[in-house]
Protein backbone atom coordinates (compact mmCIF):
# COMPACT_ATOMS: atom_id res chain seq x y z
CA UNK A 1 0.00 0.00 0.00
CA UNK A 2 1.44 3.37 -1.01
CA UNK A 3 0.60 6.05 1.56
CA UNK A 4 1.87 9.30 3.05
CA UNK A 5 1.49 10.13 6.75
CA UNK A 6 0.98 13.81 7.57
CA UNK A 7 3.00 15.47 10.32
CA UNK A 8 -0.22 15.83 12.31
CA UNK A 9 -1.03 12.12 11.97
CA UNK A 10 2.51 11.21 13.02
CA UNK A 11 2.16 13.38 16.13
CA UNK A 12 -1.20 11.79 16.93
CA UNK A 13 0.31 8.31 16.60
CA UNK A 14 2.96 9.29 19.14
CA UNK A 15 0.43 10.93 21.48
CA UNK A 16 -1.71 7.77 21.53
CA UNK A 17 1.33 5.44 21.74
CA UNK A 18 0.45 3.88 18.38
CA UNK A 19 2.87 2.57 15.78
CA UNK A 20 2.84 2.63 12.01
CA UNK A 21 1.87 -1.05 12.21
CA UNK A 22 -1.22 -0.07 14.23
CA UNK A 23 -2.11 2.45 11.52
CA UNK A 24 -1.68 -0.14 8.77
CA UNK A 25 -3.88 -2.58 10.71
CA UNK A 26 -6.61 0.07 11.09
CA UNK A 27 -6.55 0.68 7.35
CA UNK A 28 -6.31 -2.96 6.25
CA UNK A 29 -9.02 -4.48 8.45
CA UNK A 30 -11.12 -1.38 9.04
CA UNK A 31 -14.09 -0.11 7.11
CA UNK A 32 -15.18 3.26 5.85
CA UNK A 33 -17.79 4.52 8.31
CA UNK A 34 -18.22 8.04 6.96
CA UNK A 35 -17.55 10.01 3.80
CA UNK A 36 -16.86 13.73 4.14
CA UNK A 37 -16.11 16.64 1.85
CA UNK A 38 -13.57 19.28 2.86
CA UNK A 39 -15.38 22.63 2.94
CA UNK A 40 -12.41 24.60 1.60
CA UNK A 41 -10.84 22.29 -0.98
CA UNK A 42 -13.98 20.22 -1.79
CA UNK A 43 -11.79 17.08 -1.61
CA UNK A 44 -13.37 13.86 -0.41
CA UNK A 45 -12.17 12.48 2.92
CA UNK A 46 -12.96 9.15 4.50
CA UNK A 47 -13.24 8.04 8.12
CA UNK A 48 -11.88 4.51 8.45
CA UNK A 49 -12.68 2.68 11.70
CA UNK A 50 -10.63 -0.35 12.64
CA UNK A 51 -8.55 -1.82 15.43
CA UNK A 52 -4.97 -1.48 16.56
CA UNK A 53 -2.78 -4.55 16.93
CA UNK A 54 -3.75 -4.62 20.62
CA UNK A 55 -7.45 -4.59 19.72
CA UNK A 56 -8.24 -0.98 20.62
CA UNK A 57 -10.79 0.74 18.38
CA UNK A 58 -9.34 3.62 16.38
CA UNK A 59 -10.12 5.81 13.40
CA UNK A 60 -8.04 7.28 10.61
CA UNK A 61 -9.08 10.20 8.44
CA UNK A 62 -7.70 9.71 4.93
CA UNK A 63 -7.96 11.09 1.40
CA UNK A 64 -6.53 10.14 -1.96
CA UNK A 65 -3.70 12.30 -3.28
CA UNK A 66 -3.34 13.59 -6.83
CA UNK A 67 -1.13 10.61 -7.76
CA UNK A 68 -3.58 8.09 -6.30
CA UNK A 69 -1.66 7.47 -3.10
CA UNK A 70 -3.42 7.42 0.26
CA UNK A 71 -2.79 10.50 2.43
CA UNK A 72 -3.28 9.96 6.17
CA UNK A 73 -4.65 13.19 7.65
CA UNK A 74 -4.97 12.03 11.25
CA UNK A 75 -5.45 8.94 13.40
CA UNK A 76 -6.83 8.57 16.92
CA UNK A 77 -8.22 6.12 19.45
CA UNK A 78 -12.01 6.02 19.74
Protein language model features and the residues they cover:
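Ribonuclease/tRNase effector modules and their secretory precursors
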Residues: 1-78
Amino acid sequence: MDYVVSVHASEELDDDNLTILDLENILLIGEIVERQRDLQTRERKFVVRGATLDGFEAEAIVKFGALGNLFIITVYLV
